[in-house]
């Protein structure tokens, strides 16, 4: 009961690129779906890596269910993100040139991985997501983001992600020395809007 490592690629090859964008899809989505979003981002010179969740979902239940109820899939999903990062590092890409983009379940997974492995990255965009668990276990989160730019966009209300968890996540990342911008859109629905793409480009992919 674990994810098979299956990384889809697009953009520049790892050999050519100096920067890498890791894109994490949402529940029921696919690596190809989220890679197609890259055409709207300022990432023409990046290598794009998108791991595919086995069975289309990173973990079975809500991200605010008790953590043990999402195991062993959750730990395997976090490990998959780590292996995707290692793929970039092994190609000679520095961590400060590795970027992240996640939507919904993929945003939650991206944020959970980053908070557990804080260091200076290129930047991160998380649309409708927060750190994972029914309660936030602050002991899991260590490191220093060294002012890594992070953009959190969400809708309020959102059926899957309470806005309170987005704010709590922003506060944790700020405590860990990330440069966080959060933007809440009233009644926008569970999707990515045009302004979020523009903000992602101006804050992170600049």
Short names for language-model regions:
Residues 27, 167-170, 174-206:
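C-terminal catalytic histidine-bearing segment of alpha/beta-hydrolase fold enzymes
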Residues 100-102, 127, 153:
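Short beta-strand immediately N-terminal to the catalytic nucleophile in serine-hydrolase-like folds
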Residues 101-106, 110:
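Gly/Ala-rich beta-loop-alpha elbow adjacent to hydrolase catalytic centers
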